Each structure stands twice: as structure tokens, then as C-alpha cells.
């Protein structure tokens, strides 16, 4: 496996005859991101408009992974000084079922951390529903790879959500870590 990081923020990874390209999303990716998150049917689906807006206004804290010019994964994140100047918070992520168990999510997060603009980031955070086990393994592995701490705390309880059917959300936090 090898990484190529361009000045535009794209990272290419070649592995077993399949090339994955990690790049900054554009507003043109909104539809593909919406389609990807809509397909599994297990994640909270927001309006398509929100994915267009995230890809446009949170592009530098987000990443799409593509192979054969098809988006196969994404992370949408935000960085605000109000929340914490050294923390990236991830709002949404998804990987195509053909890419699961291949380390795509971890590599997308590492691609973001390798971007020159985010070298002052020392923490990653995300909220995850209690039944979604894959992110826990991802954050544990990423914290081991980055040789840093890993914490999980209660964030929102089911009772806080309107209506029925939304489970508790946990806050995953890794860090502090040194520059990647």
C-alpha cells in the first residue's frame, strides 16, 4: 500500500489492483453521498440538501473515498473554535458495503489528519448509536495506531429525542495525538 498526498488534498492508495482516491468533497458530490447513506437503510437520513451543503461548506474537514470514479465512502466533519480549536467532530460517515472490513473508514480519517491544514488537531470525536458496533472497533484501532487515548461516554439518551425509535448516542473521543 502507498499514499500519495497532493497539494489539492487528494490522497491515493493502491492496493490489490484497486485504487482508492481520498479527496476533499465538492458540492457536486452531494447526490452521491446522499445515495450512499440512503442505500444501507440503517443510518439517519437527512434531506439531500444537507449533504450538498456539508460537501460545500465543510469540505476541508470532510473526505470522500472513491474507486473507479464512484464514491464508496465519506466522512463529514466540522471544526469550530467554539467547540474546541484542536478537535474535529464527525457528523456523518458511511462506507459502501463492498468496502466494509477493508479499513476504508480508518484510512479516510487518516487522510484528513494528513492534510497540512489540520496539523493542529489533537482530538477526533463522533457520536454513535449504541447498536452500531463498527465505529467502536474503528476508534479503538485508530487510537492504537496513533498511540493515544480512547474514551466513550454517554452523549444523548433515547428520551431526549422526539418520537420513538432513536437509540442512545455515545460520544467517542480519541486523543490527544501528536502531528500525523
UniProtKB/Swiss-Prot annotation:
The keyword Acyltransferase applies. The keyword Acyltransferase applies. Residues 20-180 form the N-acetyltransferase domain. Its EC number is 2.3.1.178. Keywords: Acyltransferase, Stress response, Transferase. GO terms for molecular function: diaminobutyrate acetyltransferase activity. One of its GO terms (biological process) is ectoine biosynthetic process. Pathway: Amine and polyamine biosynthesis; ectoine biosynthesis; L-ectoine from L-aspartate 4-semialdehyde: step 2/3. Induction: By osmotic stress. It is an enzyme of class 2 (transferase). Belongs to the acetyltransferase family. EctA subfamily. This is L-2,4-diaminobutyric acid acetyltransferase. The gene is ectA.
Amino acid at each position: 500500500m502507498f499514499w500519495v498526498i497532493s497539494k489539492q488534498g487528494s490522497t491515493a492508495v493502491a492496493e490489490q489492483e484497486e485504487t482508492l482516491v481520498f479527496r476533499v468533497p465538492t458540492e457536486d458530490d452531494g447526490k452521491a453521498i446522499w445515495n450512499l447513506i440512503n442505500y444501507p437503510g440503517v443510518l439517519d437520513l437527512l434531506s439531500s440538501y444537507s449533504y450538498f451543503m456539508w460537501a460545500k461548506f465543510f469540505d476541508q474537514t470532510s473526505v470522500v473515498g472513491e474507486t473507479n470514479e464512484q464514491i464508496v465512502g465519506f466522512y463529514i466533519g466540522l471544526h469550530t473554535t467554539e467547540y474546541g480549536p484542536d478537535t474535529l467532530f464527525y457528523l456523518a460517515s458511511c462506507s459502501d458495503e463492498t468496502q466494509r472490513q477493508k479499513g476504508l473508514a480508518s484510512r479516510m480519517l487518516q487522510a484528513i489528519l494528513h492534510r497540512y491544514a489540520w496539523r493542529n488537531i489533537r482530538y477526533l470525536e463522533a457520536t454513535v448509536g449504541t447498536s452500531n458496533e463498527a465505529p467502536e472497533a474503528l476508534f479503538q484501532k485508530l487510537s492504537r495506531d496513533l498511540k493515544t487515548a480512547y474514551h466513550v461516554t454517554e452523549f444523548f439518551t433515547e428520551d431526549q429525542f422526539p418520537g420513538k425509535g432513536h437509540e442512545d448516542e455515545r460520544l467517542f473521543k480519541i486523543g490527544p495525538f501528536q502531528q500525523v
